[in-house]
Amino acid sequence: MAGRSELVVSFGEMLIDFVPTVAGVSLAEAPAFVKAPGGAPANVAIAVARLGGGAAFVGKLGDDEFGRMLAAILRDNGVDDGGVVFDAGARTALAFVTLRADGEREFMFYRNPSADMLLTHAELNVELIKRAAVFHYGSISLIAEPCRSAHLRAMEIAKEAGALLSYDPNLREALWPSREEARTKILSIWDHADIVKVSEVELEFLTGIDSVEDDVVMKLWRPTMKLLLVTLGDQGCKYYARDFRGAVPSYKVQQVDTTGAGDAFVGALLRRIVQDPSSLQDQKKLEEAIKFANACGAITATKKGAIPSLPTEVEVLKLMESA
């Protein structure tokens, strides 16, 4: 990757989250909702840009008020939106999200089909994708055609151009026809990624085993990988590289809303990796990068909403120094 740019290109969905004005209620009980920009790949792109890195987003939005608003949010946050296209015949996706009293998030999606699902491979900004040092994606874009084929083609283009491929499945069971199809399609591209990040919930979903022990995690390891990460919420993160493995504790903060914390973690880690790709082979450097990512995720959880909560590098370093 010597001589390549430090650009992180995110591929996938960007949508509007509608979040209740009060916490701890079901969607049916919510008295009112506020709108917030969302979508994990877009959050990652903005996280990278907020930290001073080069970031771009590739995806499709509805040619509507919400779609134009989301594209403007990307630009306002320093993300290159040259990979964004608009669909005049489909709406921007909506999601109603609530944090129930038991702490679990509840989702209800409006996508039948939404614009993000209708991206075709002919609409890909190939030149932008070829400039990526890291090409990052989730699994929601694998659910339906034509977006699935566009996703697979974009991965090929990025890989052929020398990019690292980064995969965060970002499981949303409610969007898949069945658990079986979700598992099969999420794993269908597993072998292509250089960097994979899963949560402990996703680890259990993909392995069928409720454990974060090394032997369980290693069921998801592939010889083609450079780094496999399991995030454990406020317990930090476990990491597995080709020649070493370990765990990095998180930072203790007062959590308000964990939405976007995982995306902040991914964005921060990718930012550090493109700054110094040798950290994938150097345990000390990698642990420093993960500490930085943990701090970024922790700060994001202290405020409401994903994008407004994403920190700057100064804020992250301040937390790391005070810990």
From Swiss-Prot:
Record bears the keyword DNA repair: no
Activity regulation statement: Not inhibited at high fructose concentration.
Record-annotated membrane-spanning stretches: none
CDD domains on file: bac_FRK
One example GO MF annotation: ATP binding
Gene Ontology biological process terms, A to Z: fructose metabolic process; starch biosynthetic process
GO cellular component: cytosol
Pathway given in the UniProt record: Glycan biosynthesis; starch biosynthesis
This protein's UniProt keywords: ATP-binding, Carbohydrate metabolism, Kinase, Nucleotide-binding, Transferase
The reaction(s) this protein catalyses: D-fructose + ATP = D-fructose 6-phosphate + ADP + H(+)
Enzyme Commission code: 2.7.1.4
UniProt note on tissues of expression: Expressed in roots, endosperms and leaves.
Pfam family name, one: PfkB
Family: Belongs to the carbohydrate kinase PfkB family.
The protein's role, per its UniProt record: May play an important role in maintaining the flux of carbon towards starch formation. May also be involved in a sugar-sensing pathway.
Entry protein name: Fructokinase-1
Source organism per UniProt: Oryza sativa subsp. indica (Rice)
Name of encoding gene: FRK1
